């Protein structure tokens, strides 16, 4: 695997970790009776970023 692909894979995993953190924060806030910290728009932004990274990784291989 090339260094470029390793970097892209790391960025994809970091994005997935951000999404999991966002989900956990929203679940915690819901359990406390608070409104979500992250909206659908925030998740859509992360999804679009992950999509761009996946296309870049596909083109790099």
Locations of regions flagged by a protein language model:
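Short, charge-rich amphipathic interface segments used for partner binding and complex assembly
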Residues: 21-61
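N-terminal acidic leader/helix
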Residues: 1-27
